[in-house]
Amino acid sequence: MRFLHLSDLHLGKRVCEFSMLEDQRYILEEILTLLDETPVDGVLLAGDLYDKPVPPAEAVRLLDWFLTQLATRKLPVFAISGNHDSADRVAFGAALLADSRVYVSPVFTGAPQPIPLQDAHGTVDVYLLPFLKPAMVRHVWPDEPIESYNDALACVLRHCTPDPGHRSVLVAHQFVAGAAACESEEPSVGGVDSVDAALFDAFDYVALGHLHSPQKVGRETLRYCGTPLKYSFSEAGQCLSLIHISEPTRR
């Protein structure tokens, strides 16, 4: 099964007070052209769809246009909110969107549930995990000892056990320890928000957002795709990632 893994669109972003919306629409059009030329079975949007929790109306219209274009191509879309997004705003209309196979992570209320896809090899379960903070997880499991981002993610994934007979894809938006950050990302003091890559070991592919540089972390199938549009000089030369998952075993 083949997915296009995208993240960190940051729609509505301004760089030095210059609106990037025209450039963002251009890159989304290029992505649609890529999808027309290279068919995929689904699109993964790993958070930071917008640049701000309250995006400008033009950014909302641009995301609406992009999701509509994906839906008209009969492509299932799997989207989560990132740290720049308002989870409530991103999740608005999620039940209605699901009727068009546009699956959006709800506001965090517990362990994500699988969304199944079928192909000739069997079932692929997609799990949507929006950006997590420790307080969110403590609210759901108040008796758990959660002091850090790592504790929070570990708690959630203890309650989310993929079916070993299915291929599994997790879409998440966290900073994984050992990954390389770029200058345009929000700084973290002392890596306080980092999580251990080993926490994701139960999943065959982990589609990460948050960091703007495309990279793997540890294994080949734990990846940041990077941002499709560049927001700093340190991001020059980056490209999109096209992910192909074809077997029920980890690759």
Question: Each predicted region: which residue ranges?
Answer:
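Residue-level detector of anion-binding/catalytic polar loops
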Residues: D41, P76, Y103
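Short, surface-exposed connector motifs at secondary-structure boundaries
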Residues: A71-A79
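Glycine-rich, charged/polar anion/phosphate-binding loops
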Residues: G209, T227-Y231, C239-L242
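N-terminal active-site segment of His-dependent metallophosphoesterases
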Residues: M1-T68, T72, L170
